[in-house]
Amino acid sequence: YKKASLKPALIYIYPSLPILALWQVYLDQGMFALFWLIIIVAACDSGAYFIGKLMGKTPFSPISPNKTLEGVIGGLICASVIGTILGVFVYSFWLSSLCSFFVAIFAVIGDLLESYFKREAGVKDSGDLIPGHGGVLDRIDAVIIAAFVMVALL
C-alpha cells in the first residue's frame, strides 16, 4: 500500500467518526451534554482568542502560528470555569470540572489537528461558507475531537 493512497479516504473518515461521536453524546447523555460540549469548546476558543490578543507573546505551535501559549492557557481556564458552572446543574462538581478541562484540552488538539491537515493539503481556509472565519471546519474542528472525550468521560 502507498501512504498517498490513504489521503482520499480521510475525506470520508474525518467527518464520519465525529458525527458518530456527537450522536453518541446525544444518545448517552441527552441534549444538555451536546449543548454543554459546544459551550465548553466555544468558551475555549473565545477565551483563547481574547486572552491571546491581550497578553499573547509566546508562540504555541508552528502548525498554527497565530496561537499563543497565553491564549491557550486562557482558553483552558475559561472553558474549565464556564463548563464547570454549567455542568454542575446535571453532573457532580468533580465530573463537571474534569470533563470541562479535558474537553477543552482536546478542543485545542482538534484545532491543531485540523490546522495540520490543512497545511498538508496546502489549503488556507476550509471553505467560504462562513466568511471571515476560515470555513466550516475551522468552526467545528475542536468539537470534532472533543466529542470523543465527552463520550469517554460521561
Kindly label every feature range from the protein language model:
Residues 151-154:
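Juxtamembrane boundary at the C-terminal end of a transmembrane helix
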Residues 1-68, 72-105:
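Membrane-embedded alpha-helical bundles of polytopic integral membrane proteins
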Residues 41-57, 69-70, 105-145:
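Acidic (Asp/Glu-rich) catalytic motifs at the cytosolic membrane interface
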